[in-house]
Amino acid sequence: VGTQQGRLFRISGLSDVYTQEDADSKLTVDLILTTGAGGITGIAVDANDNSRLAISCGGYGSADRVRFTENALAATPVFNNVHGDLVEMPIYSIEINLNDPNMVVIGTEFGIWATSDITATSVTWSDENDDNSYIPIYAMKQQHLPRSEASNSGVVYVGSFGRGFWESTDELFVGTPEFANTPSTEKFISDFKVFPNPIQT
């Protein structure tokens, strides 16, 4: 869990918690990082190896907004500053690529950026903005389910400031088509029910 004060906590034992009493006795909370670089805005865990973790931080004026560790499960993980050649800008969201764990994609004040090797001595970031221009990217999530469980396995979804939601397709971010304002010409289903219905109690 990341905080606005730049602290990162690791919570262990959640799989054994079923009641408040369990939480009091079975949870372990460890402070594993204090960034000093602004609030933690994003946390990405490698879907293939949960000892690999990357975080993003907000705020201007500092070149330490992206951190990475390969020993997140250790008692005292070592986080490296992987801000690299990025401009000193806020980083709002972050993902470790499911299919290439050395690739990290970030959402920034100025759009989408990526590195092909987060473990490099000097990390180089590339501009991935293409059609969605240099707009703040506040949310980013990759579908981690395998193709046998999800047809969109590996697709990255991003939420922008003012330009809507986008999805990745062959490394190019394209907009998801919007619904037209015209009524559907398909047959109306009058007895269609959705459960549970949050409107009815």
Give residue ranges: language-model regions.
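Residue-level signature of beta-propeller blades and closely related beta-rich strand-turn architectures
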Residues: 5, 14, 59-60, 72, ...
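A short loop-to-beta-strand structural motif that recurs across blades of beta-propeller domains
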Residues: 7-10, 64-68, 111-114, 155, ...
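Short loop/turn segments immediately following beta-strands, especially the blade-tip
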Residues: 12-20, 70-75, 116-121, 169-175
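Beta-propeller fold detector
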Residues: 19-33, 78-84, 124-130
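Conserved blade-ending motifs and adjacent loop-strand segments that build the rim/top face
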Residues: 37-38, 81-95, 123-147
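Loop/turn-rich, solvent-exposed surfaces of beta-rich toroidal or solenoidal domains
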Residues: 44-67, 83-120
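Surface-exposed, proline-anchored Ser/Thr-rich loop/turn motifs
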Residues: 45, 181-201
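Blade-level signature of beta-propeller repeat domains, shared across WD40, Kelch, NHL, RCC1
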Residues: 135-175
